[in-house]
Amino acid sequence: AMSTAELGKSLAEMIRKDKVHILTCTGANLEEDVFNLVAHNQYKRLPNYRDLSPSDELELLNNHFNRVTDTCIPEEAAFRRIEDHLLHIWEKAKSEGKRYFPHEYMYQLLLSGNLEKFYEIDPKDSWLLAAAEKDLPILVPGWEDSTCGNIFAAHCIEGTLHPSITKSGIEYMIYLADWYRDNADPGIGFFQIGGGIAGDFPICVVP
């Protein structure tokens, strides 16, 4: 929800000014910054969302809108713009026998330049693009609980991809333990996007 609320308008500048050195976020917040970047004009705003009836909610669902409070994400339209490019990156990793973290695949996607023709906001307002340009570490535990994670799993079920090309949450945990020991002094800018696992995960590692 934070990415959908356009957190990037403030966070991207913080990243560019080196105020943030590592991030943790949910899989949804990782991908929703990209969705907003490439499909912003197709979002639907619902300032009176508290007055929605069950039939109103059903209509949104049938029109492929995913409501996050007062904002509806056109997930199908947004994902359609990135799917082929992301699938190509996954397939390339498989063919080369390489493995990456979920955020690293998104970095490859953004830095390839293939999405630039779809940009519907000023790219300086994308926090993920700013992080990609700085190559900041991003912890994305439970990434499979996201649209991109679901699609990746579907390709694995079909046999076109293999789960092993995406590094796991355990590997994120080990990475953070090593990174924290190397970088904790004299202090770091650690930024959390989203609740639940995005906050619990790093707290489990630090002690």
Where do the protein language model's features map onto the residues?
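Short acidic, glycine-rich surface-loop motifs adjacent to enzyme active sites
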Residues: 1
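Conserved catalytic alpha/beta core of Sir2/sirtuin-type deacylases, generalized to analogous enzyme cores
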Residues: 4-207
